[in-house]
Regions:
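Short "repeat-start/strand-capping" segments in structured domains, especially the N-termini
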Residues: 64-67, 115, 140-143, 163-167, ...
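Parallel beta-helix/beta-solenoid
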Residues: 70-75, 91-95, 107-154, 169, ...
């Protein structure tokens, strides 16, 4: 069988099973040394490490320092705190392969310069409080993949630094301050994920990333911002469903990005929906050049009057085309500079141009 395929169900003996190295999934025993021994036993060309069903507690990070390591559970089990009655049932053995970062600053740390690491079919949790990092790619990795990962009760679910050619697919990372943080790198693909954060954090933040593809994701409340692209170029944001209680759903700075066919939904009409942004910040805020926004839908439940939905007052060549906005009560639905094109979105009297 292909070891890279999803592997569900029970098993008797699988090569690389961490319990053969002394790991005990009882929700109490520190398993970091045993699991790192399993990785150390792999040949230099890599191999497979399997986490069976159970709660494997970590007081130190699992460190992946070899190329072509596949680190996988059998299935990620229950996902949400609200799927079960009581936190003890979520953390109890059975119902999935779980890593609990009790005292580890990261449950899994992928060392700098490692290629071909695949992590899949796991739940990664901070335990009963939101602390630590779930999975941390510490620098200059290549051809990594995260698939079918649940991250919950962490400070940051996934942190990726300087990665190239990274795939993050079919992951559920919610009920924590920050779902995903990307720093540097290029050709990173986040697809078919469900992400949700808390107002002390940002759901997904990418800083200095080139060619990020953020496609077909479901982004729930309650992050301060849903997606922040800070100094990112040549990115594609397409087919996502963004839902938030706060303005600043998408905050973008950079050049030559494409934002197409997304739904942006500001809901709840909360009195604190501005946070500290101000009523001219917009649920979409753009700074940069030659960014294209085509065929997006914006639904705005404002608690205030004459609020800006889209702010593009810095940069040139930014284009908003064929976008639908349901709330046209404000006189300045768009607040843009003269270098921004707005076509087939709203009537011209709803576009306020700043000098």
């Amino acid at each position: 069988s292909d070891d890279n395929l999803l592997c569900y169900g029970t098993h008797t003996e699988i090569e690389g099973d961490v319990t053969t190295f002394g790991a005990v999934g009882d929700g109490k025993t520190d398993c970091s040394k045993a699991i790192n021994s399993a990785i150390a036993s792999l040949p230099s060309e890599g191999g497979v490490v399997v986490i069976p069903e159970g709660d494997f507690v970590l007081d130190a990070p699992i460190v992946i320092n070899k190329h072509n390591v596949t680190f996988k559970g059998l299935n990620p089990g229950m996902r949400s705190n609200i799927d079960v009655n009581g936190i003890n049932e979520l953390l109890g053995p059975g119902g999935g392969s779980k890593l609990v970062a009790r005292n580890a600053e990261a449950a899994i740390k992928v060392e700098t310069g490692v290629k071909g690491v695949k992590i899949m079919n796991l739940m990664v949790s901070g335990g009963t409080e939101a602390k630590n990092i779930g999975i941390h790619f510490a620098g200059t990795s290549d051809d990594g993949m995260l698939s079918n990962i649940i991250g919950i009760n962490l400070h940051t679910g996934v942190k990726i630094e300087q990665a190239k050619n990274m795939q993050i697919i079919n992951c559920w990372v919610c009920e924590l301050p920050n779902s995903m943080v990307l720093i540097g790198g290029e050709n990173i693909n986040i697809k078919n994920c469900q992400l949700g954060a808390q107002p002390t954090g940002i759901t997904c933040k990418a800083q200095g990333v080139n060619k990020l593809s953020f496609v077909n994701n479901q982004v729930y409340p309650d992050g301060r911002e849903n997606l922040v692209l800070d100094g990112c170029n040549n990115c594609i944001v397409e087919g996502n469903n963004f839902k938030s209680y706060y303005n600043g759903i998408l905050v973008l700075s950079g050049n030559d990005n494409r934002v197409n066919k997304n739904i942006f939904w500001l809901t709840g009409a909360l009195q604190n929906q501005m946070l500290d942004h101000g009523d001219d910040f917009g649920i979409i805020n753009v700074k940069g050049n030659n960014n294209m926004f085509v065929s997006n839908s914006l639904s705005c439940e404002w608690a205030y009057t004459d609020v800006v939905a889209v702010n593009a007052t810095q940069g040139t060549g930014n284009v908003f085309k064929n976008c639908f906005i349901d709330n046209l009560e404000s006189y300045r639905v768009f607040l843009v500079n003269a270098g921004t094109e707005v076509s087939n979105c709203v009537s011209s009297d709803k576009v306020s141009i700043v000098e």
